[in-house]
């Protein structure tokens, strides 16, 4: 499912997987999103270059959002397109500004999950929907615990970062199944 024009085990490979996570939040078939994102990368790889979203003259942030939104729709990635176009621009800008345009650096030190979560999860939107927290290296838009685990496993599986211990990405439906079949039991805030 990787784009033909993507060098394996490269920074661009890591960026592709990082951006793919925007569609892994539920509500869309993972394979479908991957196929459409693959085609988008093969035809317009420049949109996967984080610096495109930071040092653009005469283009506002809203202009960048509108531009990527139109491309996402064109490539049939319209599931949550309003959110994902904003997240795309915000996350690319944060990668440029704080992580040398490279998602692998989020995990270069094989962090424990608490550290990884702190780096990836954080407040990103204000009450009036302005970007906030851009000055901090921590916090990517629409990334929660499941996505922090998922990007870690994506990058480890692709041999883009060294293996380290992190929880598996589990969503609400899997947890509901595990608890209803008494595979795990929850007492208060503790899991047995």
Which residues are covered by each model-predicted region?
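HhH-family (HhH-GPD) DNA N-glycosylase catalytic core used in base-excision repair
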Residues: 1-192
């Amino acid at each position: 499912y990787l784009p033909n024009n993507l060098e394996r085990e490269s920074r661009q490979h890591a960026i592709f997987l990082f951006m793919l996570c925007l569609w892994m939040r539920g509500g869309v078939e993972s394979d479908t999103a991957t196929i459409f994102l693959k085609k988008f990368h093969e035809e317009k790889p420049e949109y996967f270059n984080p610096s495109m979203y930071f040092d653009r003259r005469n283009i506002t942030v809203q202009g960048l959002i509108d531009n990527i939104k139109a491309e996402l729709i064109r490539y049939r990635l319209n599931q949550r397109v309003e959110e994902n176009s904003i997240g795309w621009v915000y996350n690319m800008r944060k990668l440029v500004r704080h992580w040398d345009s490279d998602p692998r650096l989020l995990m270069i030190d094989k962090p424990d999950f608490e550290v990884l979560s702190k780096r990836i999860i954080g407040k990103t939107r204000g009450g009036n929907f302005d970007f906030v927290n851009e000055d901090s290296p921590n916090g990517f838009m629409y990334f929660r615990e499941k996505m922090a685990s998922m990007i870690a496993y994506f990058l480890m599986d692709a041999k883009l970062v060294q293996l380290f211990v992190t929880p598996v990405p589990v969503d609400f439906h899997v947890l509901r199944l595990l608890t209803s079949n008494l595979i795990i039991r929850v007492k208060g805030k503790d899991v047995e």
